[in-house]
Amino acid sequence: MADDGMLLNFEIGDAPLKSQVKFKGGRWRDRLKAQRSAKQSHEDGPSSTPPRNRTTVGGYDAGRLGKRPRTEDGESHRYAKVPRTSDAAPKAPSHAMKTGQISSSLFTSNPSAVTDFDQPPAEEEAEPAKASNAPLSEEAENFHSLGVSRRVAQHLATKLEMKAPTAIQKNTVPQLINGDSDAFLQAETGSGKTLAYLLPIVHRIMSLSLNEDGTPKDTKVHRNSGLFAIIMAPTRELCKQISVVLEKVLRCAPWLVCTTVIGGESKKSEKARIRKGVNILIATPGRLADHLDNTKVLNVGTVRWLVLDEGDRMMEMGFEDDIKTIVGKIRADKLEKVNAEGVVLDGVLPSRRVTVLCSATMKMNVQKLGEISLEDAIHIMAAKSESDGDADAVFAAPSQLKQSCIVTPAKLRLVTLIALLKSTFARRGSVMKAIIFISCADSVDFHYQLLKDTKAVEPPTPDSSSTKDRNPHTDTTVARAAYITSPANPKVMLHKLHGSLAQPVRSATLNAFSACKDPAVLITTDISSRGLDVPAVDLVIEYDPAFAVPDHVHRIGRTARAGRAGKAVLFLLPGCEEGYTTILNSSTPIAPQLYESILQKGLASVVNLPSTHTTSETDKQTWSTRAEALQLHLEQRLLANPAGADDDADDNPNPFRGNKGNHNNNTKPKSKQYKPKIDNPLLDAARQAFRSHIRAYATHVREERVYFDILQLHLGHLAKAFALREPPGGIGGGVARRTHTAANKAAAERKSKVSGGGGGGGRVGFGRGAADDDGDGVGAVDEDAARRMREKMRMVMNASSEFNIG
């Protein structure tokens, strides 16, 4: 067919072979992108219809938008308002912000636990476990048979309802009454170590004034007779508690006086009490060392006993140098055999200075403390049958304590905690008091603010009975709780306690928690883990695992004390943290629990939101939908505008652009439009709590970091545990970051003073006087908000940036 000479003619018309498409309107960048898109589509394949003129705004296609994620209110919003393609219409800036907030689901993308929850539980004993720290039988032992005077023994039985000693008291009291050697007391928490060393001291001091049959002697000892015993404890709370116990014992001997000298109190008042006279002094190491240096009336020549309670904790807190100084000064003073009034002390009191060291653990730092303070000491334990090979081991928890751990993903930690507390207080009288241990003070503050009721408390009338009971020191640390109440317990009191609070606030809060008749929850740090004996504590929750195993033992020792039953719950993350239970020395197995069972039990009924919030829940909702709704509610609380904030910004999205059609540059906008947006204080507290939690997570002891690997933390998931939708920045600043911030603040204050000292000529919303920042970070928030506002104004007003291709 190639040789037949056939020719074919095609009519293509007068139109050009390639269609020329012109794009009009919009910005030049948008037109350039449209041309490139048309060129690409022409190269991919010809089309019978020319490409449509699609104008993109803010980097998004205005003709057809892709699928958008669903937001918190269940509707799909556009990222930016799409203007008309007319040239006269105002164009949206290229830096248009997204207005939708994305909230991820709680039950997706969670790591799976490696613990086998299907393993059948261990067979429970037919009879409940016998309490290991309970008092002995009254028929077998009593305090009088241990050598305590009949007056003291009768006082303990009738006034304090203590008729029988515990095991550690049985082994310690006779030894300290009849002997003068140093002693190291080692026993589990809640076993009565405090009375074990207090009773011999009180008995032998009372013997200076009373005969064995209780008849008075010719010489009577009083508060000016001399200082006979010094008791040191690591924390102020423990000193206060020892003082309370000792005052109860000394009611049978009112001529003897005890007092406390602790940090945070007035040194002038402490000196006045010492000057009046004291027989037993209870102190923290730092304040005692200060008084030994500066208080001349403090005479330690008559001191016969030096007690170091919770010695391991004192070494961990860095009191080694203070203890060396105190022990050295006491030993350097000559031992007086006769006091200033001529009362002979030898023969009744020890002929040498006796040092008693108390600890529930036998660690290297305790052994070092023993080398500093003890000489030829005897080792006294609760059970003499224990082998010496276990001396280095951590003492186990009481046998009647039931322990469990909840393996919950990071996303679900917060709602699981609320569900656990809600189920705990579901029945009246089941649990009276619960303690939640958290790793850092910032996290304690955040969880307290989050869980408390937001309804403002009405001030009591002058005639009401609550006016007399009201303590101004607890206004910021005690409140009614929300979320965790139930019809059986409509009132649950919430308390917080940590070391950053002032001493009067700490003491008042602890007293309020101890004396509370309603169900109560204490959110605290490790400051409450040592020695505190709060009555009716039935539940201990370790929301954050302890930094070391000994701290874990002391934490759970706040419950199941003196033979009472108790429960302890440990929160762990899936993964490496699950192996942490293998190193916990426990007399009872730690039972793992599924977080689903906690949520099902706690969220079986409607959650009671704070009084200022309304709920749309119904009884037909499932526990999973309630968990998601609760998490969403908590996140919305953080994102809500703070009280008194300016909410008129929605009327004019751009405060620097006048009303539509108004081009008069002389028109001044309202001053409220220049106010920078201030974040919700609860949101700032959540961010700070998250940062502090991450830093605290990295401080576990070296031997346990294999179970707490910070590199395996999912920061985005962990942010949900603080009701945050994304992890905040500024985690790794440390001291350098704070120093740099402080330097910037100082420079800004100097600049403001030079420019006018914060007078009336400053711009609204941008100037910041020196009084705006009171040291709590609020001024930094305002300064950062003003900086962001200035940057946004420059981006809007600077026309040259539109043509900056780079």
UniProtKB/Swiss-Prot annotation:
It comes from the Eukaryota. Gene3D superfamilies: P-loop containing nucleotide triphosphate hydrolases. InterPro entries: DEAD/DEAH_box_helicase_dom (IPR011545), Helicase_ATP-bd (IPR014001), Helicase_C-like (IPR001650), P-loop_NTPase (IPR027417), SPB4-like_CTE (IPR025313). One of its GO terms (biological process) is endonucleolytic cleavage in ITS1 upstream of 5.8S rRNA from tricistronic rRNA transcript (SSU-rRNA, 5.8S rRNA, LSU-rRNA). The keyword Endoplasmic reticulum does not apply. It catalyses: ATP + H2O = ADP + phosphate + H(+). Residues 24-135, 642-677, 741-784 are annotated as: Disordered. Its main location: nucleus. Residues 174-380 form the Helicase ATP-binding domain. This is ATP-dependent RNA helicase DBP7.
